[in-house]
Structures are given as structure tokens and as C-alpha cells.
């Protein structure tokens, strides 16, 4: 199914997120994950992979692409399943805002503090939260290895004030304290191939990876075309036509 079900649409509207089980098939996960491991672990010590630290000193590796090309990463970001899902939920013509890999290595991957994606996309020149992300689990993702956590329904708050702390952009503490009192805190366990689809104003975070397992996730974020940044604040996120490809095309790409 390329578009959300009625239940998924309702969950997105009310809860700000839903999980689509088996979004990628097992062969697709293996193909994409094995390629990613080979390429990105080779790049880990180069300037093309960033390190994002947390307050304890642990670091998560991050690879960000500015454009979606014809390689395996770009082709998955252009896959019709992600594009049609995003278009249906946003309700407007969309384009790919960014795509990135977050890599929490065993015993090393750091935490991400509570934030809203729109908390910093707004500062990049996007006026409205007509944006979402699709987070695809490439490994088993659970509480032990730093799965995503959400405050269920918190997207209804709109954009909250954020502050810069320890190299991260986090929700200002008084607002966070009030939000955690009001909304249910959910740990989102995921199997490889599952996809978490979430609103740009949903409060979310993840803990450090304290396990002996990898916890990698591929994140594609989409924006309404009319909501493209009004200023070129970053190399990524600016409007480019999304050239959608058939489902699974990435498996034939290098």
C-alpha cells in the first residue's frame, strides 16, 4: 500500500506518528543495510561523516546528503512508497527536504535530547510545519540500544522554543517539563524494515546505545513545495523536483 490506511491517517492526526510494519521487505533491508555498513563505516573517520556528541561524551555518527542522486541512498529517498506516503499525509505536492543516516555504534552511540524537527527547520527558513520524516529501522531498535521515544500527541503544541546545548538543539526545559507532564512517553520498538512516520512538531528523543548491537536508522524528510525555505540557510533542504522511482529500484543501484 503506497498511501496511509484510514487508521494510519487517524494516528498521524491524533498521535503525530505511526509505525508501518515491514515497510521494507527483509531482502530490501539486507541489501540496503549491507551496502550502508560497507560504505559508511569506511567513511567513518572522514569529513563526510559527522559526529554528534551528547552530554555524557558519547557520539552518534551522522551522514547527511544534500541531494538525492542515483546511488542506493538517493534512490530509496525517491522511492514511490516514501513519496506517496508523505504526499498523502502532508496533503500537498512535496519534495525531499533531507535524507540522512544516524549510526549508533555498539556501546558508543550517544543520546539525542528532546526536540522537534521543526524547531530547527523553522530557523532554516521553512515557515510552516507541513513537513514530516520517515525513519526506517535497519537494525532491531529497542530500549537497550537507543530506540526513538516520542511524546504521543505532542505535535498539537505547535513549535516550542529551543535552545542550543552540548552541540544539540533541544526544547527549552520549562516547556519540556510541562509537555512531559501532559503527554504519554512512548518507547517505539521497531524491527528491521519497520518505518516510523512522524510529524515535524512531534517531540522525540533517543537514549545512548548501551548494548552490543548496532542501531542504525535511515531518515528521509519531506516538505510541501510551497513551504520551501525562503532563504538559502543550508546546502540541504532547498527545493529540487522529486524524481520519484518505482518501489525497490534502489536494490539495482550501486
Predicted regions and their residues:
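Non-heme Fe(II)-dependent double-stranded beta-helix
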Residues: 1-15, 21-114, 119-124, 163, ...
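Short glycine/proline-enriched turns and hinge-like loops at secondary-structure junctions
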Residues: 113, 125-126, 209-214
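Short, conserved beta-strand element in jelly-roll/cupin
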Residues: 89, 115, 122-143, 189-192, ...
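Double-stranded beta-helix
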Residues: 141-203
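Short, solvent-exposed loop/turn segments at secondary-structure junctions
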Residues: 25-26, 102-104, 119, 141, ...
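Non-heme Fe(II)/2-oxoglutarate
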Residues: 42, 46-55, 195-197, 201-254
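Glycine-rich, charged/polar anion/phosphate-binding loops
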Residues: 118-121, 135-136, 182-184, 202-205
Amino acid at each position: 500500500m503506497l498511501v496511509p490506511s484510514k487508521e494510519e491517517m487517524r494516528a498521524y492526526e491524533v498521535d503525530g506518528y505511526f509505525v508501518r510494519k515491514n515497510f521494507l521487505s527483509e531482502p530490501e533491508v539486507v541489501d540496503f543495510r549491507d551496502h550502508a555498513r560497507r560504505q559508511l563505516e569506511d567513511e567513518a573517520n572522514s569529513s563526510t561523516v559527522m559526529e554528534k556528541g551528547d552530554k555524557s561524551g558519547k557520539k552518534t555518527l551522522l551522514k547527511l546528503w544534500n541531494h538525492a542522486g542515483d546511488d542506493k541512498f538517493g534512490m530509496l529517498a525517491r522511492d514511490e512508497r516514501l513519496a506517496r506516503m508523505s504526499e498523502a499525509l502532508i496533503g500537498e505536492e512535496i519534495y525531499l527536504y533531507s535524507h540522512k543516516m544516524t549510526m549508533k555504534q555498539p556501546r558508543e552511540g550517544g543520546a539525542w535530547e528532546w526536540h522537534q524537527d521543526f524547531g530547527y527547520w523553522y530557523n532554516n527558513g521553512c515557515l510552516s510545519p507541513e513537513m514530516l520524516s520517515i525513519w526506517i529501522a535497519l537494525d532491531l531498535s529497542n530500549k537497550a540500544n537507543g530506540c526513538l521515544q516520542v511524546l504521543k500527541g505532542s505535535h498539537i503544541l505547535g513549535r516550542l522554543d529551543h535552545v542550543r546545548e552540548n552541540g544539540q538543539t533541544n526544547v527549552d526545559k520549562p516547556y519540556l517539563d510541562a509537555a512531559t507532564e501532559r503527554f504519554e512517553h512512548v518507547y517505539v520498538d521497531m524491527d528491521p524494515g519497520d518505518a516510523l512516520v512522524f510529524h515535524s512538531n512531534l517531540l522525540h528523543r533517543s537514549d545512548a546505545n548501551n548494548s552490543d548491537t548496532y542501531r542504525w536508522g535511515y531518515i528521509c524528510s519531506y516538505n510541501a513545495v510551497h513551504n520551501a525555505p525562503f532563504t538559502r540557510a543550508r546546502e540541504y533542504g532547498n527545493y529540487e523536483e522529486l524524481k520519484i522511482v518505482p518501489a525497490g529500484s534502489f536494490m539495482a543501484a550501486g
